[in-house]
């Protein structure tokens, strides 16, 4: 029976088929390109170039023929359009960069290409990664494959929708305040945001430099581990990249997946694992359907040998105001470079130089980006810097300290990714505050720089996916992936696909 993308359940399955010559990288690429074309209504991709993709696939086949293949050689992947890519336009979902072509590849793209992965195209996203629904893109909103009248989550919504719909077996994403975890939850896939600095930011178009972090999005923890092997590691071109002395050593995350815990048994592989449940994550605001799915998943973890422990993260409610001071402040600085002079959109008609700046930025940026630039400029202005920005940084430190206290009582923290399942397209666009509140459970992890992931754990209202959030201590990606993998070995939520 010939290999087909219809039967794909994991990247390992693809890698094994390629190694066994059951399918060639070129044949696989052609099949996924056909799926992308058939799934255009989702609007998950903003750039596809079959010639470039097939050239990479042929190179992967040649590499395998020469005996130089890695576990990822020939495996297709889609890249979020926030990573610059030579040969494809790199737009960050914005009119400002609608025609920008980068002369180089982002380190993440470069490393995965070096492993032999084949780029299928660039995925849609909220403009400059600012959004929770993928409705802020210059190229239009993305639809959720489980219900096309709903959002896929954001800002990595195109990547999430592409993986969920089978248009790509894996994708890259970025997470500033939840932009890998929330769309993974809404779209029923697995995604991990590594410790800040684990994955290079070089070539990632910046939103908030002290928060942005790249990571993989795929169907399973095993897939994410395989991808993280290729993505993680120190990069001298990124000043925020972790050096080996600070934890930037590349681990073999796939090998660690199956490493038995001390005292574990076949029926209880997680014996001795302490799971912290923050009381602030299970109170007012969490919808009943989401909580029901989470409680069932936690009961499964108990069957696997884990112990549930109550912990507290008292400053959780402050994470929204803190984030929406720090992130816009950094965005206003990062986006000041887009002035219509060096690169980016330039207004066709203008008077003097100042008028050109104003018109180019007014035309090039969308409403949400303008809103955040204005907020950021305000909190950094004279008379408000001390009152807002510095105070927010102090509370950020307290939020990080809260996590460290919690980790003295537990090994992994679990809770919801979002208060609800995916909402309807257009439902929250008129009320930015309601949109911001959807990130209440993911922001604090980002502010602390901790690793976090979303794992499918059931379904809620409208038969929409629900994700369980796993949060680890610094550099604890291996334990997070191992914990998620054990759950996925015992359940099949990650194998469910939209009709």
Swiss-Prot record:
The active site is at 80 (charge relay system), 155 (charge relay system), 179 (acyl-ester intermediate). One of its GO terms (molecular function) is ATP binding. Keywords: ATP-binding, Ligase, Nucleotide-binding, Protein biosynthesis. The keyword Nucleotide-binding applies. GO terms for biological process: translation. It catalyses: L-glutamyl-tRNA(Gln) + L-glutamine + ATP + H2O = L-glutaminyl-tRNA(Gln) + L-glutamate + ADP + phosphate + H(+). GO terms for cellular component: glutamyl-tRNA(Gln) amidotransferase complex. Its EC number is 6.3.5.7. It comes from the Bacteria. InterPro entries: Amidase (IPR000120), Amidase_CS (IPR020556), Amidase_dom (IPR023631), AS_sf (IPR036928), GatA (IPR004412), LisH (IPR006594). Heterotrimer of A, B and C subunits. Allows the formation of correctly charged Gln-tRNA(Gln) through the transamidation of misacylated Glu-tRNA(Gln) in organisms which lack glutaminyl-tRNA synthetase. The reaction takes place in the presence of glutamine and ATP through an activated gamma-phospho-Glu-tRNA(Gln). Belongs to the amidase family. GatA subfamily. This is Glutamyl-tRNA(Gln) amidotransferase subunit A.
